[in-house]
Every structure is written in structure tokens, then in C-alpha cells.
A protein has these predicted regions:
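Sec-dependent signal peptide recognition
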Residues: 2-10
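Hydrophobic h-region of N-terminal signal peptides that target proteins for export
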Residues: 11-19
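A composition-driven surface/loop motif
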Residues: 21-273
């Protein structure tokens, strides 16, 4: 039944995307919330602080994994480098214009196999906030499914953003923002993840470079699928798009690549759908 639900949901999301330019992911938040029970975080010890609408995680050492599940309305904050947040059937939403998940230090988001996870950010803010946001580097991995909706500005935002693993990600920003906004974007070798970039000004927008060595990318209804700054924006930095492997499928994008022309090196064939 879980696999059937995944297929049906993905089918209707993609049909909606292909049928009308600018159509958003149609998620019935109310019915989805009801599918998720009480919020649970493991371990729940003195490294976890719970206040009204905020859960702060601050392990004393690096490389600690916290498994989270259930429903939470507010913000989850990580303060320690290399902390892993393992999503195991979780629905996190923030309706105050803030990130639903925020990292002060390098953070990894990992989805558990066979799980469906929702990270939603709504409301208004003068800041260009994302549903998942990290002040430092951010890694997205695992083998489950995540629906990330950033209705404030961006879907995902970090310094250097790396995708890995075999999971499926549906990420949506806004008509002014990006599905992924970062300094540099990296996709590791020999990974099979699927990244659906939906209904935003940009799919992946990097200040410097986009380097992709594997993965499956789907860009639907974005202004530009892959975009970096140029020498005109910042002459002191290297800018370019380098895609050596993986797959790229696009539908209703105004432009696929936007970077320094001599530094746009793409090996896989771009498939128009």
C-alpha cells in the first residue's frame, strides 16, 4: 500500500505540473497532518531542549544521529557540526515565515527507507528563508521520500549543498526564489537519488559552481533549471556548471543553463518532456 501511495502521489504531482504552467504541488495539509502521530525524537536527552514552538539539538560531540518522527509545528534547530537528522515519517511545518529545520552548524538530513516526510514553511518574512535552511554546509541523503515546500522564498538553502543517497525529493520554492539556493552545489558519484525541482524562479541557483557526478534531476516549471552567478556578479570567484554524469529531464523551463558560457560543461543529454 505504501508503494502504491508513493506512485499515485507522484503521478498526480507530475500530471499537475505538466498540465498548467506555474501550478503548485497540491498537498492537502490537513489530511496529511492527521496521518502523523505525536512527535518523537530519539535520543531524547539533555542535548535536546524543548521550548514553545522550538526544539534545539546541541550534542556535545559531532556525528550524532537523531531520529525524528510524527507531527511538529514550529522549528527544529541544530547547533552542533555534523549532526544527522534522520527523518522517519515526519511532518514538520512552520507558519511564521521561518525555516522548519534550521542548522547553525553543518547538518545532514537523511530520510529513512520506505518513509514519507513533509517539511513545510509558510507565512511571511522580510528574509529570504527556506523550508530547510543551514548557515553552514548542508547534506541531503537517505533512501526515503521528502516533500519540501518553501512558500516563504526558497525550498532548501545552505552554504555548500550536497545531495547523495537513493532517496526521492520533491522541492518547491517560490516564483522569486529557488528550489535549492546555495554557494556551491554538489552531487556525489554513483548516487541514484531523484530530485524534482518545481515551480520556482530557479531550480538550482548557486553563487559559484554546480558540480554533478550522478543523480536524476527533473526541472518542471522553473524560470531557469540550473543557474550560477557570473564574473559580472563576482569576478573574484569561479563560476560554472559541470555535469559529468546522471540524467536531466526538463519541462516548461524558460532556460535550462545560465552561467559563464565557457564554463558550462554538460555531458548527459537533456531530455525535454
Amino acid at each position: 500500500m505504501k508503494k502504491l501511495f508513493n506512485f499515485v502521489f507522484a503521478f498526480f504531482v507530475l500530471v499537475g505540473i505538466c498540465s498548467a504552467n506555474g501550478q503548485k504541488m497540491n498537498i492537502d495539509y490537513e489530511s496529511k497532518r492527521n496521518l502523523y502521530g505525536d512527535f518523537v525524537i530519539i535520543p531524547m536527552d539533555n542535548t535536546v531542549t524543548v521550548t514553545d514552538g522550538c526544539i534545539t539539538i546541541a550534542p556535545k560531540s559531532e556525528d550524532v544521529t537523531y531520529t525524528i518522527s510524527g507531527y511538529f509545528n514550529g522549528q527544529i534547530v541544530n547547533k552542533t557540526k555534523n549532526t544527522v537528522l534522520k527523518l522517519k515519517n515526519v511532518f514538520i511545518e512552520n507558519n511564521k515565515g521561518e525555516a522548519a529545520i534550521y542548522g547553525f552548524a553543518k547538518t545532514e538530513i537523511s530520510t529513512s527507507r520506505g518513509t514519507e516526510n513533509y517539511i513545510i514553511s509558510t507565512g511571511s518574512s522580510d528574509l529570504k528563508n527556506a523550508a530547510i535552511q543551514c548557515k553552514k554546509n548542508l547534506e541531503m541523503g537517505g533512501s526515503g521520500t521528502a516533500y519540501v515546500v518553501g512558500e516563504v522564498y526558497h525550498g532548501v538553502k545552505g552554504d555548500d549543498v550536497k545531495f547523495k543517497g537513493s532517496g526521492v525529493y520533491y522541492i518547491q520554492g517560490t516564483e522569486s526564489g529557488s528550489t535549492v539556493n546555495c554557494h556551491s552545489f554538489i552531487a556525489e558519484k554513483e548516487k541514484s537519488f531523484k530530485l524534482y525541482m518545481l515551480n520556482s524562479k530557479n531550480g538550482i541557483k548557486a553563487d559559484n559552481t554546480i558540480m554533478i557526478e550522478s543523480g536524476n534531476f527533473y526541472s518542471y516549471n522553473n524560470g531557469t533549471a540550473f543557474k550560477t552567478d557570473t564574473l559580472a556578479d563576482n569576478p573574484a570567484e569561479k563560476h560554472g556548471i559541470f555535469i559529468s554524469n546522471g540524467s536531466i529531464r526538463v519541462h516548461k523551463n524558460e532556460k535550462v543553463f545560465d552561467t559563464e558560457e565557457k564554463f558550462c560543461k554538460v555531458r548527459p543529454k537533456v531530455i525535454e518532456e
